[in-house]
Regions:
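Ser/Thr-rich, low-complexity intrinsically disordered terminal regions
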Residues: 1-214
């Protein structure tokens, strides 16, 4: 498996704690401001007794318009929990996942400020579902490598023209599979790292908002 910033439970999680000169009430107030500044259409789940605030967020990873004018978007989703107490706080960023969403444009007569309708949405938990997908990709890659080695070990000197052509096609198909698999690995890692960088940045902005002390 490529090296991703996962904790022992196999999740992308940035957790931390810090000291502050602020009281719990002041920190809760600043944390709410931070949430509204960093999350679109934020809904806060607040537990006043524990000083806990939780909010979900997402950001766009990729967007592609298809030939049929449908749009496919991939978004990273996550949840942030901040627990405030007098002069100290703790935070975690977890429940990371990806949504693959397909949008279809409305007909003009149906449009009233909204241009697209979501017709399909698939949630991929991270890293759980991605680990399964990548394990499948590794197995496929191993199978293709075995087929390629078998083909290369054969004596092609006695092949007829049609068989050689089929052999070349199989080689090309195998090469295409290798390329697609490698591209997939890079895409998955880029998405993971983009998410990690984004979450790390969020953690730093929260630290600044709360005037955290070293």
């Amino acid at each position: 498996m490529p090296a991703f910033p996962l904790d022992e439970a196999g999740r992308i999680e940035i957790a931390g704690a810090g000291g502050s000169a602020l009281t719990r009430q002041e920190m809760v107030s600043r944390t709410k401001e931070w949430i509204y500044d960093n999350f679109e259409e934020a809904t806060i789940d607040e537990d006043a007794s524990s000083g806990s605030l939780r909010v979900s967020g997402s950001f766009l990873i990729a967007e592609e318009e298809q030939e049929n004018l449908n749009t496919v978007m991939e978004l990273m989703a996550y949840a942030v929990t901040v627990v405030c107490d007098d002069y100290r706080y703790a935070y975690s960023i977890d429940d990371v996942g990806a949504y693959v969403v397909t949008l279809v444009p409305f007909a003009e007569e149906e449009t009233s400020g909204t241009e697209y309708e979501i017709v399909d949405s698939v949630y991929i938990s991270l890293p759980g579902d991605y680990v399964v997908l990548m394990d499948d990709a590794y197995r496929e890659r191993a199978r293709l490598r075995g087929e390629l080695e078998k083909m290369l070990a054969e004596d092609v000197s006695e092949y007829g023209r049609s068989r050689l052509r089929r052999y070349e096609q199989e080689l090309q198909q195998t090469a295409d599979w290798f390329t697609a698999t490698d591209d997939y690995y890079r895409l998955v890692k880029e998405n993971y790292m983009a998410c990690y960088d984004h979450l790390t940045g969020l953690a730093e902005t929260l630290r600044a908002a709360l005037g955290a002390e070293e």
